[in-house]
């Protein structure tokens, strides 16, 4: 993987860059649609590529490991061939599931024992095995195995967890470096900064991650319930330490406002289930603000979903029709809303990049944040 930093905004730390992988190029800032089990819910690959214009998607190691399983994925030739996605893929390591499956797992120095949410069967992930699993899945960018601490989190626990994550990272790097890609193309390993909401821990973790000198870096353990101000504060702390010549990935973030504010702090990559999850509940992000399509005010509104939208569904379908589908619980309603929301997120980061390059990102961002806070 190569990263070319094209320019930095004169009034903030926002950056425009280009990531090159063996499955194609990624213009940054970038939003990555989440395909947890190998699919972005309700969206065909052709729609993702041609209509939404996604440049990279995300898969979930924990879910793919359990189903369809490594045997099927390896026989298929990796996730790209299994799901037909021709562009880059990023996989997380399962560390977030360590956090989210708190009732089903046990953490020790060696690794994590957890019970499957599908059938209750027991499994054990070590940092080394997390690398092996991601070699089989075959994503272009893979993540180190870490523990994502909850919020709130007591200082002592956050410190011990961070230090263990650092030890796990060394084991991940050793395993990654002694193995090769199974499918003939390059893979890249990103370490993850942790430290909860403690300034000194975030600084220490960022310094350690930077010292590992990998090709890109991630920030984890944010957007887990802490106030947005804490998210921005600790993103700011970390991005001032991580090297500028490598991409920075803020994991699991977030709302359009979160994305805009952290682009301004120097973040390059984002993922979040929000656009598709909200879509399935009738919540739409538009260029003028936020819409609950189930509200009665849209019942006879025959205007396009978003006249400024970039996807086919934005101009072809009306708000009234989408409301009808959503209220009726028709599958098509969730599909249309998902395509719209994902297209909006991709449009948002593309516009951010355009304005960073043009030199007017700050005033554009200020106006967009105002619009994104508006409920229509």
Predicted regions and their residues:
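Glycine-rich phosphate/ribose-binding loops and adjacent secondary-structure elements
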Residues: 163, 175, 179, 188-305
């Amino acid at each position: 993987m190569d990263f070319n930093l094209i320019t930095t905004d004169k009034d903030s730390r926002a950056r425009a860059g280009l990531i090159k992988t063996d499955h194609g190029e990624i213009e940054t800032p970038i939003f990555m649609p989440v395909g947890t089990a190998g699919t972005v819910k309700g969206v065909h690959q052709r729609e993702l590529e041609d209509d939404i214009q996604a440049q990279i998607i995300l898969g979930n190691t924990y879910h793919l490991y359990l189903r369809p399983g490594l045997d099927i994925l390896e026989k298929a030739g990796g996730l790209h061939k299994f799901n037909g996605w021709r562009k880059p893929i990023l996989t997380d390591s399962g560390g977030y599931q360590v956090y989210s499956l708190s009732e089903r797992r046990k953490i020790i120095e060696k690794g994590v024992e957890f019970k499957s949410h599908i059938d209750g069967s027991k499994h054990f992930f070590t940092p080394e095995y997390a690398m092996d699993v991601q070699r089989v899945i075959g994503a272009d960018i893979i993540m180190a195995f870490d523990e994502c601490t909850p919020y709130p989190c007591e200082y002592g626990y956050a410190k011990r967890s961070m230090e263990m994550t650092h030890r796990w990272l060394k084991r991940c790097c050793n395993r990654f470096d002694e193995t090769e890609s199974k499918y003939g193309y390059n893979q890249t390993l990103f370490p993850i900064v942790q430290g909860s909401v403690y300034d000194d821990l975030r600084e220490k973790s960022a310094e350690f991650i930077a010292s590992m000198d990998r090709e890109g870096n991630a920030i984890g353990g944010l957007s887990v319930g802490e106030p947005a101000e804490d998210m921005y504060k600790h993103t700011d702390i970390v991005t001032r330490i991580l090297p500028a010549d490598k991409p920075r990935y803020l994991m699991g973030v977030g709302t359009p406002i979160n994305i805009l504010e952290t682009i301004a702090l120097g973040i390059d990559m984002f993922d979040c289930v929000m656009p598709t999850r909200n879509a399935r509940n009738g919540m739409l992000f538009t260029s003028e603000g936020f819409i609950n399509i189930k509200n009665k005010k849209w019942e006879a509104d025959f205007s396009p979903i978003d006249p400024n939208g970039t996807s086919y569904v934005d101009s072809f379908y009306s708000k009234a029709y989408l409301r009808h589908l959503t209220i009726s619980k028709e599958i098509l309603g969730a599909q249309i809303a998902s395509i719209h929301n994902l297209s909006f997120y991709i449009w948002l980061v593309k516009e951010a990049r355009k304005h960073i390059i043009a030199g007017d990102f700050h005033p554009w961002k200020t106006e967009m944040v105002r619009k994104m806070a508006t409920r229509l």
